[in-house]
Structure formats: structure tokens, C-alpha cells
Amino acid sequence: MSPRIGLTQKMIVDAAAEIADQEGVNGVSLAALSKKMNVRPPSLYNHINGLQAIRAELAVRGLTKLFDQMADSVTERKGDSAMLSLAHAYVDFAIENPGYYEAALLKVHDKRTEIVSDQIVCLVTKLLIENGYASEKTAIHATRGLRSLLHGFTVLIAKEAFEREEDILESLSFSIRTFLSGLLINNKNIM
């Protein structure tokens, strides 16, 4: 069977991202994709190598878009300004792109995800070290702590769990500044 004219892998992954935004990554299936794209499921195999390949593409795109947004947010910034901007970029990305964000957290066996994940870790650890929040020895621990804090905020915002009237993004900034203050104290005590 020849590929449908005009159907591309990019179109399939774009459709998968739309489904993931609405239904989560588990909602992405070949049946859901074929229905959304108005093609028979076997037609998809002319362009992709199954559901795992689609998930891998979503993960790569998600991680790449997250990295780009984080890297852009810290251009020409230092200290708290850089870290706050990075934190808000992370949370904004996750809220605005729930499908890509969920896919970015998937464990897929694809070298590209490892490369982009390493770029994200290097970006954050470099900022933490350059701005005095961590040493080479503590940077990974600080990065994990920051990621956990940001992911927690992301999940709670997505679930609409913050029901009080206080501004959520102010709460995020407050939490990040508090976390960074703790890192500064910890880093000075270690040195």
C-alpha cells in the first residue's frame, strides 16, 4: 500500500501532540490517530514505526521545546533573575503544552532524548554553579530539588489544586527564592 499523498510523519506527530494535550499521552493510540487524521491505521505505518516511535518523537519534541524555552528565558540574566525566569519558563511550558510535557517525562529508548535531557541538566547545573547556588559536588542535587519543586507546582496548577485567591505565580516565585536562599546558605557552609 502506498503512503497517502500529503501525509507525513510530522503531521502524525502533530496530531499525536493534540491528542496528548487533550487526553494525555495514554490517549494517543493508532486508532485515535487514524480517526483524527481520517486514515486507516495501516496507512500510519507507512510513515511511522508504531506507537512507541510516536511516543519517542513526542518525547524528543517535548524535551527540545522545553530546553529551548528554558534557554531563551535566561539569556543575559544572572542570579535570582535567571533562576526565576528559568522556573517560570519551565512551569509555563508545562501548563501550555501538557501533552509535550507529559511525553518529556516518558522513559523512551532513544538517544535523542538522552542528549536533550543532558542539555537541560547542563543548563540548570551551569546556572546554579555560575551564580553561587551550588558547587560542582552539589549541583546535581540542587538540580533535582529544583526540578521536583517545579514539577510539583506544575501538577498542582494543572489539577487546579491551588484554590485560594493569592496569585499562584507569586507563590512560585516565593518558593523559588526560598529554595535559592537555602542553596546559598548550604553552598557557603560547604565551602
Curated annotation (Swiss-Prot):
InterPro entries: Homeodomain-like_sf, HTH_TetR, MT1864/Rv1816-like_C, Tet_transcr_reg_TetR-rel_C_sf. Pfam families: TetR_C_33. Residues 29-48 bind DNA. Residues 6-66 form the HTH tetR-type domain. It comes from the Bacteria. GO terms for molecular function: DNA binding. Keywords: DNA-binding, Repressor, Transcription, Transcription regulation. Gene3D superfamilies: Homeodomain-like (1.10.10.60), Tetracycline Repressor, domain 2 (1.10.357.10). This is Uncharacterized HTH-type transcriptional regulator YobS.
